[in-house]
């Protein structure tokens, strides 16, 4: 099962959290579509800012958006001008009060979304796919990854037949729920067609915290 399902969804509620946090008694479809519009708008607006994840929280008529990026300076702008302009645009898009929080990604080489996007951009620039995969795995291992797997599929190097190639280093245990596996799939649009890039990164194990039980008090009169 761990080999087929999305590793991020497989670990939801265990070691990974949801990217949208809200509850709706009614109007669920409209709220979900609004989340999709927000993410699409931010992805298009900040396509060169190395944005990995957009988390959305809702409370009453307020939307809190956390943008995880490896280039916070580009998102914020001089004196906060860029992020303020983005906030006003999202206010107009949603007709709600929007608050934006910028979260810096300290190690972009351990973020599957950013690694996959980097490989896809290299493929679009006609870089050899094996070289792009090898360099990505080497950077991830140097950054502290326990393992990484990169897969590309499509008409690689303009071949007539579509095929699949992958490069792996270290361990990537997909069925171990405590293993912090980050996964992403990005498409590269080349002159030969669309090439899919998938990345799995093992960032180590997250052990569940043990809750200490309070010591039981002795019963009145002692043991009998």
From Swiss-Prot:
The region annotated as signal peptide is none
Query: Would you name any one GO CC term?
Result: cytosolic small ribosomal subunit
Disulphide bonds in the chain: none
Q: Would you identify the family this protein belongs to, as annotated?
A: Belongs to the universal ribosomal protein uS3 family.
Show the Pfam families listed in the entry. KH_2 (PF07650), Ribosomal_S3_C (PF00189)
What GO annotations for molecular function exist for this entry? mRNA binding; rRNA binding; structural constituent of ribosome
How does the annotation summarize its subunit structure? Answer: Part of the 30S ribosomal subunit. Forms a tight complex with proteins S10 and S14.
Instruction: Please state what the protein is called.
Output: Small ribosomal subunit protein uS3
- HAMAP family, A to Z: Ribosomal_uS3_B (MF_01309_B)
């Amino acid at each position: 099962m761990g080999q087929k399902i999305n590793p991020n969804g497989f670990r939801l509620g265990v070691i990974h959290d949801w990217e949208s946090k809200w509850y709706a008694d009614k109007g669920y479809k409209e709220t979900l579509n609004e989340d999709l519009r927000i993410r699409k708008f931010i992805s298009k607006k900040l396509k060169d800012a190395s944005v990995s994840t957009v988390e959305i929280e809702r409370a009453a008529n307020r939307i809190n958006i956390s943008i995880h990026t490896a280039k916070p300076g580009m998102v914020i702008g001089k004196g906060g001008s860029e992020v303020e302009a983005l906030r006003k645009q999202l206010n107009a898009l949603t007709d709600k009060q929007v608050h934006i929080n910028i979260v810096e990604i300290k190690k972009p080489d351990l973020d599957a979304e950013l690694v996959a996007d980097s490989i896809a951009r290299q493929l679009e620039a006609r870089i050899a796919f094996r070289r792009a995969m090898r360099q990505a795995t080497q950077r991830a291992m140097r950054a502290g990854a326990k393992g990484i797997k990169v897969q590309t599929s499509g008409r690689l190097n303009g071949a007539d037949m579509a095929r699949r190639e992958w490069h792996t280093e270290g361990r990537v245990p997909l069925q171990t729920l405590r293993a912090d596996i980050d996964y992403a799939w990005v498409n590269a649009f080349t002159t030969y067609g669309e090439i899919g890039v998938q990345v799995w990164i093992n960032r180590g194990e997250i052990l569940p915290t043990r809750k200490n039980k309070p010591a039981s008090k002795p019963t009145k009169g002692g043991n009998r």
